[in-house]
Amino acid sequence: FGTGAFELAPDSTNSHAMNQVGEIRAGQEIGLWDKGDINNVLTFVSKDDMEFPYYMPVISTAANPVYYYIQFQTGNWLLSAKGDKETCQPASLHNGNLDDMLWRVSEKDGKYSFVSKSGKILYISDSYVNAAKARNVKDTLFTMVESNNALGGIEIGKSTTGRNFCNMFQGAGEGRLISFWDLGDGGNVVRFVPAEALVPVSGITTFNPANKYTLWYTKPATNWMTSCLPIGNGQFGATLMGDVAIDDVQFNDKTLWSGKLGGLTSTAAYGYYLNFGNLYIRSRGMSKVTDYVRYLDINDAVAGVKYTMDGVAYSRTYFASNPDSCVVVRYTASQNGKINTTFTLKNQNGRNVSYTVDNNNQATITFDGQVARQDDHGATTPESSSCAARIVTDGGTITKNAKGVIEVNGANSMTVYLRGLTDFDPDAPTYVSGANLLAGRAAATVNGAQNKGYDALFAAHKTDYKSLFDRCQLTLGDVKNNIPTPQLISSYRDNQQDNLFLEELYFNYGRYLLISSSRGVSLPANLQGIWNDNNTPAWHSDIHANINVQMNYWPAEPTNLSELHRPFLDYIYREACVKPTWRRFAQDMGHVNTGWTLPTENNIYGSGTTF
């Protein structure tokens, strides 16, 4: 499993080792299983080597106060004190008083107290969590326990059991009240994020997009599901939150699935569409940012972030190339030597990450992984994966720092080429083949992209995308796109010209999403297209056959994107006419000897549930 990977066994002669039994998530029991199983493997990481964000805080003392944002995992909202003796609320970093959102933590006899930088003490008042300048000590003591929710993190409570854990009351959202609910609820789970990891921004006042059909925003995203910006080449893609301090390039490949091969099974066993990984690009030396804008240009299929800091204009550009099969990230600045970043690549499925710097002042980050799968007879055949990221700069230096990760110093510009792929093979009996070739394929892809160069890569991407996107045009009015997209949505009922443009923009966004999620491998876009930020997504982010997968393709024929139907149609033909499982479903479910059928919930391996 690589250098630095271990298994813990009762003794050296025992054939079993410590294992994550059943599902891989917080709160699962730890048991024993055969040595060599991927779910045994662990590494030892010191607290000082942990990357942002931390889950547990450093305890403050009078001489050394350490402040954190307390961030809810659902929605990424921050715990904020409001007025004196008022109920606390979830808040956005970019709305409100930062001193009300920063907290230091003290501990005594296993109980914890929280004081904001503005001097307000967290306390319990009836069924709510309040903050005030002064309170009776007995009301200010809380517990902290590790959550058993799949999100992973900490829950703050007034005891260690029962309906006593701080919760975003009536759902996640800015301005909600903080109350209490059962341990394990997704609205409870928090992490402690160091103050320097989040940077406040002020948005740009005027912005004229290069192209009319552009989604644009004046603050970073705080909620992945509702606010991230997706890019994709039809099979491999990424989502972008636009944070200036830690740029999270979360990426997916349509073929990375856990679960069962063929046959009907329970909802728990047919698997999940998985998060492939996260490339964290941390910009060092950050201070307050102005003129911030993030955007998704759907005319050219390119996303970006622009901002100003200390008089320097910074720009970040992102696109997913179909011709060159990779995601590309580029950083530039208006002054030379201003790009200073640290890279951390997170493998979300269990293998070590390798960081190397070559003699040409260029860096490569790689990892390999395996995902557990099981057939009807209980035999396990893993799906393998591999990822490579190539980092090149104009000027500056690239080194491995003391923590062993990649650091860029004093660059004029920086470009990253990223690819993750699996050994999924829809024509193979076990749906996989060629695992031993994956690392070489990933490396060849990013090296080929680097050799081609950024300008040629972007030109090829743009030509390829526009050959599809430009086939259809809908014009409902002559309106300039000079209003941020959230404001365009909120004013939809009030301005006829703007609401016509929103409909025009929405129409084209649907076509963009289909182009970005239905090319390459013969699999349809799933419930979330190709985008997914966790390993236990809603409805497994599956191929939902009652109506959802059909809806993905409603724009295909009417808007002249007919060939984007091919991955879906090829998937149906393969599973219905070539593979045996869907014909067996007709016998087992419909008690007929001819024809085929499929269940509502389906994975990519021909399996589905009895739901």
Question: Predicted regions span which residues?
Answer:
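Lectin-like carbohydrate-binding module/patch detector with strong preference for beta-trefoil
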Residues: 1-200
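Aromatic-residue-lined binding/catalytic grooves and analogous aromatic/hydrophobic interfacial grooves
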Residues: 200-611
